[in-house]
Structure formats: structure tokens, C-alpha cells
């Protein structure tokens, strides 16, 4: 990135969860984006909310996430995902690689 160029930060689901929980969040880039997988993860959290207060907080978090640029799952992202998972397996990392996290990482590799 050159001087004066604005970077885009790809936000992971954990950033939204930290904000919802009142956790500390470092300064974010001026422009942010997210994988549509993050929308799915936040929607799942909303659907699994056990009470109305949690449901309300999660609905607010999902609404905030929807204001960011959403990056769709494309063929390039899926190819990157396959390579990332294969590389992890080749390095001996198997069960600890969550496909949702790998998909978000693949999105970051392609788009950011």
C-alpha cells in the first residue's frame, strides 16, 4: 500500500463478538469489509440466542455487520480455501482447522 492509500480491513466474526461483549477493540481501518461467512455466523448466533436481551444484542451486532462491504464466496476464494486447508493438513494441523475460519482467511487472502 502506498502513502495516502486507504486500506481495507477484513473483519473476522470475533471482532463483532468482542464489540457485542464490550471487549477492547484496537483501532480499525477507515474502510472495513467482511466475508459473507461472518454474516452467517452472526445470524446463527442470533438464532441460538437463549433470551430476549441476548437476541436484541445479537440483532444489533448483525445489523452493524451488514453495514460493512460484504465479500461473496467466489471460485477464487474456494480455491484459496482448498490450498489453505491442504497446507494446514500437510503441516500436521487437522482437526483444529475450522472451515468457517479457513473460509474467512481465504477471503482475506483474495480480497484484502
From Swiss-Prot:
Q: List required co-factors.
A: Mg(2+)
- Give start-end of the signal peptide: none
> What keywords tag this UniProt record?
Hydrolase, Magnesium, Metal-binding, Nuclease, Toxin-antitoxin system
Q: Per the database record, which ranges form the PINc domain? A: 10-109
Instruction: Quote the SUPFAM superfamilies the UniProt record gives.
Output: PIN domain-like (SSF88723)
Any idea of its EC number? 3.1.-.-
Q: Which residues bind Mg(2+)?
A: 12, 101
User: Which EC class heads this enzyme's classification?
Assistant: hydrolase
**Pfam (any one):** PIN
Stated family: Belongs to the PINc/VapC protein family.
What name has this protein been given in UniProt?
A: Ribonuclease VapC8
* Species of the source: Mycobacterium tuberculosis (strain CDC 1551 / Oshkosh)
